[in-house]
Amino acid sequence: MKFGVVVFPGSNCDRDMQDALQYDLGQEVIMLWHKDTDLSGFATEDCIVLPGGFSYGDYLRCGAIARFSPIMQSVIKFAGEGGKVLGVCNGFQILCESHLLPGALLRNANQQFISKNVYLRGEGDQGRALMIPVAHGEGRFYADEKTLDELEAGGQVIYRYADEQGIVGAAGNPNGSLRNIAGICNKTRNVFGMMPHPERACSEALGNIDGRAILKALFIDKKQPSVRKEAGLVNI
């Protein structure tokens, strides 16, 4: 499996994502610049990643300008053909702005930037809660009741905020997200978005590798051999 990590002006988690995928999980990574439009080197079993940061300075609205960047038209087409797409934090906001995922990410309920470890419960997961960092000012997931019910009915809620014991409730919700939603997918289950940063919890050196479980569960075929290739920015 091959990963393409998109770099927008203002991205600041692109290299974190590269390191997690390439060095911690042994996957092939290609860095993509926001002006790139050719994704013909990626097959539908590959994945394009929209990382965290402040794309285009988050002017107007988080992800609102990045949604119109040259590469996003290709990403939308890639997703429509069944290719895998992951958006983390600002990447999740971009996916919602692009209408690849429903809903919106609003200002945190406490009106403050939040940077801390939180706990996540995967839907249907009976294991322990995963500790994953968040770092956002606009991470409160919102959608109308009809959309929320459709997400629930379709099994599209993939992660919810929880407490350390894995109990989903107000105590574990850092930003006021409706129904404690931390991550969702589309109906065809090839586009995924989440506010927490799994790439920041993949290295033993950081004392937390819970993020590996998330990335592996979403994408990586455990039967395939690991590969390591150097990744560099292209077409800057």
Language-model-detected regions and their locations in the chain:
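Beta-strand-turn-beta hairpins that frame and shape the catalytic cleft
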Residues: M1, G124-A129, N186-V191
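N-terminal beta1-alpha1 cap of cysteine-dependent amidohydrolase-like domains
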Residues: M1-G87, S98-P102, N108-F113, E150-E152, ...
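Active-site-proximal beta-strand elements of phosphoester/diester hydrolases
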Residues: F3, M131-A135, F192-M195
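Conserved beta-strand scaffold positions in the cores of enzyme catalytic domains, especially
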Residues: V29-M31, V85, I132, G183, ...
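Active-site metal-binding loops of divalent metal-dependent hydrolases
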Residues: G53-F54, G91, G137, P198
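Pocket-forming structural segment of enzyme catalytic cores
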Residues: E97-L178
